[in-house]
Amino acid sequence: MFFSLLLMLGLTEAEKIKICLQKQVNSSFSLHNGFGGNLYATEEKRMFELVKPKAGASVLNQSTWIGFGDSRTDKSNSAFPRSADVSAKTADKFRSLSGGSLMLSMFGPPGKVDYLYQGCGKHKVFYEGVNWSPHAAINCYRKNWTDIKLNFQKNIYELASQSHCMSLVNALDKTIPLQATAGVAKNCNNSFLKNPALYTQEVNPSVEKCGKENLAFFTLPTQFGTYECKLHLVASCYFIYDSKEVYNKRGCDNYFQVIYDSSGKVVGGLDNRVSPYTGNSGDTPTMQCDMLQLKPGRYSVRSSPRFLLMPERSYCFDMKEKGPVTAVQSIWGKGRESDHAVDQACLSTPGCMLIQKQKPYIGEADDHHGDQEMRELLSGLDYEARCISQSGWVNETSPFTEEYLLPPKFGRCPLAAKEESIPKIPDGLLIPTSGTDTTVTKPKSRIFGIDDLIIGLLFVAIVEAGIGGYLLGSRKVSGGGVTKESAEKGFEKIGNDIQILRSSTNIAIEKLNDRISHDEQAIRDLTLEIENARSEALLGELGIIRALLVGNISIGLQESLWELASEITNRAGDLAVEVSPGCWVIDNNICDQSCQNFIFKFNETAPVPTIPPLDTKIDLQSDPFYWGSSLGLAITAAISLAALVISGIAICRTK
């Protein structure tokens, strides 16, 4: 800390002069009012700057997230890293296989990659899905699977957001009726899906032309390997016939395929005995698959004769922990047809954050692998953020952002505020001024400027760590003014209040994220109102903090002035008499200029003939006059005598 003092001298008798500490403030200073004390400062700055979110994905904790991907996150791909949209570090966090997707592993169409997706993490990032798209041309009793994919991805994101672990269960225990055998279909490239499996029944047209009703059973486990299963995602598949005649060419009954739970309750399927046919004119059935969320247990499947579609796989979730879900848009480059099922599924799932490109996919390794824009959007996965949201991620500590961050959002997210509404605090050169504080009745040292200020402003200081250092609890040990400890004690409660405020804000927003309502806009409007109220409350608290901060530093600096005045009085001994706070009378005949330099300029090299017992060089480190308040002048190795400067001396003699 540096000091700049202006000493003003006035003559009281022919041989005596009066020296006082004098204010040194001009129009370049601004006044800052505080609780218990005010400050003049040469500079000011906002307590916090507005932060801008970075577009793309990030995570709150590197140790608690997991990714599920394909070739664009597959480190084992022969073209890695040119084929990847993530760094090698991030690729290690993904469960990936080139050519794979969650839906391919669920249904297992012939000739496609079948990968066992499983893993645990509070935050799950999904960058997959493109391998089951129109370009894949999967044709098995339907050509367009986009609506099924949309429903599948939506259920995956929903269950993943409520679970710590998830796993594909690729082999369910089952019991198949004796008359049914595993079959293939011409409409499925003379093969069939692994899930559901197709079982057919040979029928003797002359004796039993309609066949027997199929009754089968499957069991959803409570555990698959090391993975606990509290809920399963099951595909309930069945055929849709346009008319009874299309199905019943032999004059038999209506088509049905129904799943029952252990109590006999229908949980999925289609029953044309009670539901009408489509009425269309097609002569080939279409396969439909609904997504069911089922608890572990034994389920039965009943179907009309000849065909049985049997669930063989599921995705299992432990439902132990809620957490963020990030879905990354998964599309092809030029020349390949994509769908937008991932985008639509995420946007319709509470708690899911969607990462979307603004430009077409342009790969580096080939047209479909290694897009620079996607690499930038996913580069945040290498870091930890304080806040993740649909608007992007933030790792700065400021509690405010210019624009409202769109939900869902997680972590310590900044609130929207206008720049001009953020309180300003003093910075640069600081000078305490007078103030009254009835709560300070017995300060541990006499404080100039509280009720008995001398001639006005006394003291100029440069806060080494910047004034923000006091608020954030970080400053150097050296320097004057308030200490880190006193600032922390003074603001501890308010600091805790702010954290509680932030936490309660995030909890409220996360609860709203979890709500499902037919009026989504009403929920968003309510969320915005809550955040605006929180922002105003936080700005109000910061105003209080600013006033306390100014007062705290002002008082601390004034205590430092008392230390300075005490040192001057002690150095002067009987040569100077303190006639009022900050003013001394000296006999000019007894204490000459070198003597005055020693007393008031702290001149360590000047001879002091009038005080022979003292050394001519002073080491303030060992000077007993500086033993005292830790809030006083912190004279340390970093602050030497050379840092003390008398900026001006005026001597006036009176008759």
Curated annotation (Swiss-Prot):
GO terms for cellular component: host cell plasma membrane; membrane; viral envelope; virion membrane. Residues 1-14 form the signal peptide. Residues 15-40 are annotated as: Fusion domain-1. It catalyses: N-acetyl-9-O-acetylneuraminate + H2O = N-acetylneuraminate + acetate + H(+); N-acetyl-4-O-acetylneuraminate + H2O = N-acetylneuraminate + acetate + H(+). Its EC number is 3.1.1.53. Glycans are attached at residues 26, 61, 144, 189, 395, 552, 603. Residues 652-655 are cytoplasmic. Residues 15-630 are extracellular. InterPro entries: Capsid_hemagglutn, Hemagglutn-estrase_core, Hemagglutn-estrase_hemagglutn, Hemagglutn_influenz_A/B, Hemagglutn_stalk_influenz-C. One of its GO terms (biological process) is virion attachment to host cell. HAMAP family: INFV_HEMA. This is Hemagglutinin-esterase-fusion glycoprotein. It comes from Influenza C virus (strain C/Ann Arbor/1/1950). The gene is HE.
